[in-house]
Curated annotation (Swiss-Prot), chain A:
Belongs to the Mediator complex subunit 8 family. Pfam families: Med8. The keyword Glycoprotein does not apply. This is Mediator of RNA polymerase II transcription subunit 8.
UniProtKB/Swiss-Prot annotation, chain B:
One of its GO terms (biological process) is positive regulation of transcription initiation by RNA polymerase II. Its main location: nucleus. It is found in: Nucleus. PANTHER family: MEDIATOR OF RNA POLYMERASE II TRANSCRIPTION SUBUNIT 18, MEDIATOR OF RNA POLYMERASE II TRANSCRIPTION, SUBUNIT 18. The keyword Manganese does not apply. Component of the Mediator complex, a coactivator involved in the regulated transcription of nearly all RNA polymerase II-dependent genes. Mediator functions as a bridge to convey information from gene-specific regulatory proteins to the basal RNA polymerase II transcription machinery. Mediator is recruited to promoters by direct interactions with regulatory proteins and serves as a scaffold for the assembly of a functional preinitiation complex with RNA polymerase II and the general transcription factors. This is Mediator of RNA polymerase II transcription subunit 18.
Amino acid sequence: MSQTSPLSEQADSSLKYDYSNVPAQALDAIRMRLAQLTHSLSKIRDDMSKADLPQWYSLQAQLSVTLTQLSSLTSTLQHFEDTLECTVPYPLPSFPTTAHEGLLTTLMRKKQIPEVENWIKDAIDHSGLDLEGRNWDEIESAIQRDKSTTARALDFINQEYSNYSFQGLYTAEELSKNVGDPQSMIYRSATSNAKPKAPFSVDSILTFMYQGTMKTEETSIAK
Amino acid sequence: MVQQLSLYSVIDEGSFDLLIATISALSGRSPVLFANYNHVAHPNPNYAIEKVNAKNQLVEQTRVQLMQEIPFEKLQTEEYSYKLCTKMTGDGPPIETEYLNSLMRSCGDGTRPWSLSLWDIPSAGKDRKVCTQAVVESVVTSTGGAHSSILSFLAELGYVPGYQFVQLGTQFYLENGIVFQISKLWALHGESGKTSAVTKDGFLIKAYLNVPKATDLESINQGTAHLQQLKRELRDYLELSIPDRKSMDSRVGHLNDF
């Protein structure tokens, strides 16, 4: 249905259409990324509505996956921007317009649905920009301002991050002053072998508790 | 009948502090010291008890467990905190054996209440997630008769003294009603006053939860889920597992007994 080629003169259903100009690659790439994104978003929504929340780390992992997918979608959209902007979809004559009128209107819809319109309006209102005035310089400078704020915040976080030691037993301050046992400094929680050893088996203790005998020694403590 | 859902593990002595720190941090609760004296009595072998009843059903004789908590003033220690547990490396508990030996014979008003319990063998089944065990427990507050003591009380019930042990350790009362117990056990060898460490160089870990009714499947499932959650949280550090059910069989003259 979505194609840029001019429609052939005959409205014959057996007619071969020329699909070569359909930007299939662009559409497919976007479709795939959108499918991924909707999938992860609905998974997060389902998880959040559960009675007991999943572990924080799995939520965080999901969120970061979703953000990656979102940025990948944005970059794909940017990449195919020119192609998509000049693409006009229209129904082929063979499309059953009467039978699938609802589907057709959904597919052909160019106007945003009211919810989307609302949040776009909200976002514009919150940004405090005057889009009506078409003062592009002002908008440009606002974006620049926003970017520089983000960069400053990122710098700050990185600097704060470097101030702390997230691994080992010593603080960054202690490490820079070289206090403490250098052996312990290489202690890493993830690879630590601080696992407890088992000096005896649970079963042998329980056998003693319930039957008065030690499996290991085979000597009866009971008379 | 009360159902006890439990999971067990063991740790060595060196891991005690880290485990306490781990559980404190995970639960936000502090460890509580506990100590108790246990005496397990056997059914009197002199009584010829039929193995089947009138309805031709199997009669199984079970040992009975008597437990009394040991008051903290009897502990030979300066500080009453979980730190006591790190100092219990010897062959005996930090409690006078004379006191422990007198417990069974003491009588009169000063006698502390005893907890009397019978433990069934844990439920069988391959895909069990936790150890499920039925318990009947009652509290004996006082005993009557001319020579009143818990021993004469047991004799009236048809039980003879068996073996005894002291359990001392620290426990956490976690949310969802789970009790996380880290303890040491010592066997007492009768009047000689001799004791030996059962959990030498280590601690027994027990995480348990009691469900009042065996028919309350919802609570049992919920408790199982809570214990599983704890197990998951401690995974890769402490492996909480289900012990061999045969080791928790308190029936007399049964299969692996004697």
